Amino acid sequence: MSTPTAKHPFSRLPLPPTTEISQHNLTRIDPSLPSGENPHVSQRRSKTFPKAGHWAKVTPLPIAFPYRLPRADASKGETQLGIEEWLQDWDTFQEEANDEAAGVQARVSERRSKLSPELIGLSATCINDVLPHLDVGNALAYTGVSETDDQPEKLDEAGQDLVDCVSGKKVISGQVEGKEYVPYASRYAGHQFGVWAGQLGDGRATSILETKTADGKRQEIQLKGSGRTPFSRSADGLAVLRSGVREFLCAEAMAALNIPTSRALSLSTFPLQQLQVIRENGPEPSSVLARVAPTFLRIGSFEILNPPEEARHMQFFMLGMASGGQGEDSSLQRDWEGLRILGEWVAGPAGLALGLKEGEAWGKKLVMEVATRNAKMVAAWQVYGFCHGVINTDNVSVLGITIDYGPYAFMDVYDPFHICNHSDHEGRYDYRKQPTMIMYAITSLVNSLAEVIGCEEQVLSGKAISSGWAEGVDEEALEEWGRVGADFGKEVERSVMETFKAEYKKLYLQRFGLRTEKDDDLPIIVDSFLNILAMHELDFHASFRVLSAFKPSMIPNSDSTDSSQKEAFESFLERMAECIPKKPTDQKKSEVKQSFRPWLKTYAKRVTEEDQQWQTALENDQDWQEARCEEMRKVNPRFVLRQWLLEETIKKLEEGEGLERRRVLAHILKVRFVSAA
């Protein structure tokens, strides 16, 4: 009998040991404050840090920007606050009684205590899958996820603790094994649409907590839309409700499809009179998304530490952006020591868990593991018609999980050239090119670690680099190490292509209900089917769902006199023809049927080759064809997160209130995702 999992309120979730806490192992950015600048101002002021580490302390602060300071009433003897004093008031915390077993406390200031966040979304599957030790109190019932006879109108203590923390109202901080523990934003760079974009970083995301489950799995919880950070540039660091809804639903939809992804724990908003987010079309409701992943480090986290040559001679002058201190050179510089520290962390137990021996070289293995994971991830994207929309190198995870849901879309009509991002005028990130763009990102990782790989191979003979590994090394030697690393990139590219093709084929064969692999399955079964979809502009997802009802026994023999068999086949063809999104003409339906007739006969023959395998695995004389259809339905869901549904959901959330609004997301998560098969 298994022992029940111990539950903890959010603010008391157990932290990992300090050896697995990212901020205790990666380098904190020294803000290099200009003389007289207040640290509370500094954490909100955008800066380019030429060579400054991996992360910067910043508390979540979901308030409007530009900041609006209250005007003092001179008649009452009030003194006008300056920006430093005003921001300091937000983070002058009142100590709260709390169990210190977790080593941290949830803290609130007088100003923060006036914030009134509302929890409008909570994912039970996220909790069950990755945070089974989290006690959310009555929050699931409050948001309508779990139905009870008495629907609570207020959150209980654990539920309120959750919303206070995941909305950014309260700040989790304290001491862990004698070391400070604070919220932070990560520093990274990236190539955007193929062009070096310089320092980017978490402009509207704050990592607030790391925790470890009873079975040893580490998770990081990050708030998106929680206010300005040192990487916000001229932006406000906030998120509108529609963007929060899109990521909340898509992350959980991807998880339901078994596509590697970050997870969405919760979605919060604030009353309009308290916070409105100003965008192109005027004020909009806000959102703060709590998302979860083992780490949110990405390929851009490495690029910032070893930027391409042109970046090392590029000055950054941007609206709202200051240099990294006393007005010094703001071009990015190589940080060899920071590169080593980050690489060791990512290769270790808290990252990829490569299982390296003491002193074993990690450069090649890290790159190959990141490449393999991302190749499998993008294969799943292709098989399920998911278009990310903006595969910049700063949006590609080192874990090979889908992150940063922006202008994404699941294709409706099957179109290899589908572009979901209206800003992608040249189609760089269209559906067909997604594997190539992932390879581009992996190549950027190879370039960032090229000198590490070269040094470990040429100089250290398979041993890992150590502290000071590039200190005093001349440029000629560095270039030679870089060439060795770049040559390894060719091997990585071959591996990515092979891994992608194998995973792509495996996942598609699952969707086609095939248990074995044959060399010609891709061209004969998969590609031929997709060509029919493209030729007739059929709905990608509906076509697979209908195909899940196909049985080889539907194919009539040429000499058969069984009219029911012929009727079943014609009825099935009719259903396939109805997968045209717009009401098809009889002529169009006839063309679709004619295209499918020969393909279905070939498909039926291929399926029948596996009848013995199916029959052997069955019990109680179950019909193998029906059992196969059941398996296909599990991987070809009837529910897909389509754009019209997102728009309809967002409208309901923007216009609704109270329990009715909270039930909107709960209904989709529960009815649509759970019952997807």
Predicted regions and their residues:
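Regulatory N- and C-terminal appendages and interdomain linkers associated
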Residues: M1-S186, Q434-A677
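Active-site-adjacent bridging/hinge elements
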Residues: Q94-A101, Q219-P230, G343-A347, G351, ...
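Conserved ATP-binding subdomain of kinase catalytic cores across diverse folds
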Residues: Q105, R112-L356, L399-I401, A441, ...
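ATP-dependent phospho-/nucleotidyl transfer catalytic cores
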Residues: G244, Q274, N281-H388, I401-I524, ...
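Residue-level recognition of short, well-ordered coil/turn positions
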Residues: I259, F386, E657-G658
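Hydrophobic residue at the +6 position relative to the catalytic HRD Asp in the kinase catalytic loop
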Residues: G389-V398
